[in-house]
């Protein structure tokens, strides 16, 4: 008996929408990362990009558990001497909640070309509206 491997040509991608309102940011990111990788599929193949498209709405209403809203710090470096910038999670959620969600999902994807291509299928929106109604996305509920 041989192992059946998924071919890229036989792949069909679905669209899923996740509502992040009132849900923990990390738990939403885990679910999105698994959908982007395709780990929910029966014919998941680790070396093939077999994931689906994911839309996350209401990223501004996602919550942090514990004291992370005050304690968590996001860092970025400009490359210049003394160019280390830091932003607290509270400020990040007020200004760029979609970017905070993107960083969380990006950290849960593989650090190679499969992760990069999976991240291109992630669509984040601060409000409840999204322009992907023509793709007929299915609602995915968190456990």
Identify the function of each model-found stretch:
Residues 102, 109-131:
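C-terminal structural segments of small proteins and small subunits
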């Amino acid at each position: 008996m041989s192992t059946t491997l998924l071919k890229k040509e036989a792949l069909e991608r679905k669209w899923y929408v996740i509502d992040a309102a009132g849900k923990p940011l990390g738990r939403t990111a885990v679910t999105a990362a698994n959908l982007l990788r395709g780990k929910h599929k029966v014919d998941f193949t680790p070396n093939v990009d077999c994931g689906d498209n994911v839309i996350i709405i209401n990223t501004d209403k996602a919550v942090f558990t514990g004291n992370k809203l005050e304690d968590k710090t996001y860092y970025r470096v400009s490359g210049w001497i003394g160019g280390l910038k830091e932003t607290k999670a509270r400020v990040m959620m007020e200004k760029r909640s979609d970017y905070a969600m993107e960083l969380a999902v990006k950290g849960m994807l593989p650090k190679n070309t499969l992760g990069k291509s999976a991240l291109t299928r992630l669509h984040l929106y601060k409000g409840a509206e999204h322009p992907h109604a023509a793709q007929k996305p299915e609602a995915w509920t968190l456990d």
